[in-house]
């Protein structure tokens, strides 16, 4: 979400390119495209979450989750998400179980659907999940989805709003087939200065597995800071709003364009 307000308001005069526009931080996805012929690396240095309930405490830690992007044209880029190391731990009845390893890989293609001058920016982002994670960290199934990022910079303000509806083709819990799932993010970003952006989000997800429907929700906040035109630092916190959502998630990362 940081991308909406920063890209709208902080381009330096005479800069060859506008400031880096990353999908980090937050759960919303921006409409911006990596410049043609450029690479962009968005890395989560650490991402930790915890969930308590039913006498069990579950924690997860991911180190180095990275999105690698390449600008194909001025309206499209390709992206690959990799999770080089994850650890999931469950604590219960004085004991615990833990597993760690490589996560799943996602391949995405982003296409901007509106002109650069349009007040509302809209993009399409189909994705495919490649099941590369170990069984305890993933479900071992191919999955897919489609995101439609929508962004709007409010005129004469330093505010931007964003929506990210998502529909997914998710594997059934029993591995017998697939079903529909969806998510939605509503975002508000504020460019506090030319380098600093603050954002708030509401996130919801619905998974209609034949074994039972799961609904999750969180209230999220994040901060992004431009170290330079091509480097951004970020941090954020997500707070679960129901029992099936992690109670708290904390993360920080860096994005670099070259």
Language model regions located:
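Sec-dependent signal peptide recognition
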Residues: 1-3
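Transmembrane beta-barrel domains of Gram-negative outer membranes and organellar outer membranes
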Residues: 14-258
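N-terminal signal peptide c-region/cleavage motif recognized by signal peptidases
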Residues: 8-10
């Amino acid at each position: 979400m940081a991308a909406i307000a920063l890209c709208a308001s902080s381009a330096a005069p005479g800069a060859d390119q506008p400031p880096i526009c990353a999908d980090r931080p937050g759960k919303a996805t921006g409409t911006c495209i990596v410049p043609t012929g450029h690479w962009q690396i968005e890395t989560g240095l650490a991402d930790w979450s915890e969930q308590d309930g039913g006498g069990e405490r579950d924690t997860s830690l991911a180190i180095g989750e990275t999105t690698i992007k390449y600008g194909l044209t001025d309206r499209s880029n390709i992206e690959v998400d990799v999770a080089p190391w994850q650890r999931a731990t469950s604590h219960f009845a004085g004991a615990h179980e833990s597993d760690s390893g490589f996560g799943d890989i996602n391949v995405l293609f982003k296409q901007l659907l509106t002109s650069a001058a349009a007040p509302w920016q809209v993009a399409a982002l189909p994705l495919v999940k490649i099941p590369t994670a170990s069984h305890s960290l993933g479900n071992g199934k191919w999955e897919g989805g489609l995101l439609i990022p929508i962004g709007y910079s409010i005129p004469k303000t330093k505010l931007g709003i964003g929506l990210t509806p998502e529909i997914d083709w998710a594997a059934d819990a029993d591995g017998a087939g697939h079903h529909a799932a969806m998510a939605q993010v509503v975002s508000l970003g504020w460019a506090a200065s030319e380098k600093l952006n603050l954002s708030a989000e509401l996130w919801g997800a619905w998974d209609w597995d034949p074994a039972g429907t799961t609904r999750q929700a969180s209230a999220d906040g994040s901060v992004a800071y431009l170290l330079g035109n091509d480097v951004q630092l970020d941090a954020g916190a997500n707070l679960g709003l129901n029992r099936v959502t992690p109670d708290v998630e904390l993360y920080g990362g860096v994005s670099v364009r070259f």
